[in-house]
UniProtKB/Swiss-Prot annotation:
GN (gene name): mnhF1
Membrane topology: Multi-pass membrane protein
Molecular-function annotations in GO: sodium:proton antiporter activity
Name recorded for this polypeptide: Na(+)/H(+) antiporter subunit F1
Subcellular location: Cell membrane
Xref: InterPro entries: MrpF/PhaF-like
Protein family according to the UniProt entry: Belongs to the CPA3 antiporters (TC 2.A.63) subunit F family.
Alphabetical keyword list: Antiport, Cell membrane, Hydrogen ion transport, Ion transport, Membrane, Sodium, Sodium transport, Transmembrane, Transmembrane helix, Transport
Subunit text: May form a heterooligomeric complex that consists of seven subunits: mnhA1, mnhB1, mnhC1, mnhD1, mnhE1, mnhF1 and mnhG1.
Function: Mnh complex is a Na(+)/H(+) antiporter involved in Na(+) excretion.
TM region(s), chain numbering: 3-23, 35-55, 60-80
Lineage: Bacteria, Bacillati, Bacillota, Bacilli, Bacillales
Domain of life: Bacteria
GO-annotated cellular components: plasma membrane
Length: 97
């Protein structure tokens, strides 16, 4: 029983942290702050899924955690490229069809 209380407490803390990051995404003074906050939300979502997996004793949620991690990484990479170059996909001027 104390183990479940610990997991539920950790779950509440992570969810409150996600809400704080959501405020940073909405109010963030710069685009870089918003990108970092979105990345943090992705990591916290992975933690929430892991804690629910432990609490409910579901083993196959590891695949979902990995997919969320991959999507969070790709989102951060795309936003970083957009911030650096102003566009995500660079078109070559010699590549005309």
């Amino acid at each position: 029983m104390p183990f479940k209380i610990f997991i539920i407490t950790a779950l509440i803390i992570v969810v409150l942290s996600m809400l704080a990051m959501l405020i940073r995404v909405i109010l963030g003074p710069s685009l870089a702050d918003r990108v970092v906050a979105l990345d943090a939300i992705g990591l916290q979502l992975m933690a929430v899924i892991a804690l629910f997996s432990i609490l409910l004793n579901i083993k196959y949620m590891l695949v979902v955690i990995l997919m969320v991690g991959i999507l969070a990484f790709l989102g951060t990479a795309v936003f970083s490229k957009f911030m650096d170059e102003g566009k995500v996909i660079k078109h070559d001027s010699n590549d005309r069809h």
